[in-house]
Amino acid sequence: MPELTFLPATDEDVSAIYDLCKDLVNRYEDPASMDIDRVLLWILDKIQSNIAKYTCVREAGEKVAYYCLAESNDGWELDDLYVLAQHRNRGIGSEILERCISEASASIFLYVFTGNAGAIRLYERHGFSCVQQVSKTRQIMRRDG
């Protein structure tokens, strides 16, 4: 695998990150339990307001992934880790997680859709475990630092 390059995301990346997030919401969220349109507006605002905290991952100049690692009151939160579909199962997610683990000076937590078995397996391989089921469709996973 060619070397990955980690660069700050820019305003140009907002729509790509939003589209990846929207795809997961449409795939895993229960539309009967919430106003999906309102949730998607909140997500877009969150991404736009925090784009400076996001990282764009490139391989040989091509965008292959995005993530946001930010300090919070409860440790570090890993948010919106997305590896583009055509680049999955090649170790990119693992390399990003290893980088985040080494950058974080405390525990790391994240929210994951309960139905996203591939992501859950990836996180478990890197020492994360479920600490709370927050809804029928989402859980919090944590890795202590």
Regions found by a protein language model. Name each.
Residues M1-E12, G145:
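Conserved N-terminal entry element of GNAT/NAT acetyltransferase domains
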Residues P8-D80, L84-Q86, L97-R99, Q132-K136:
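Acetyl-CoA-dependent GNAT
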Residues A52, S105-S107:
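Short, high-confidence coil segments that cap the C-terminus of an alpha-helix
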Residues G75, S107-F109:
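Structural preference for beta-strand elements that scaffold enzyme active sites
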Residues V83, N89-S102, R121-R125:
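Conserved acetyl-CoA-binding loop-helix of GNAT-fold acetyltransferases
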Residues R88, L110-R121, K136-G145:
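Conserved beta-strand-loop-alpha-helix junction that forms the acyl-donor binding cleft
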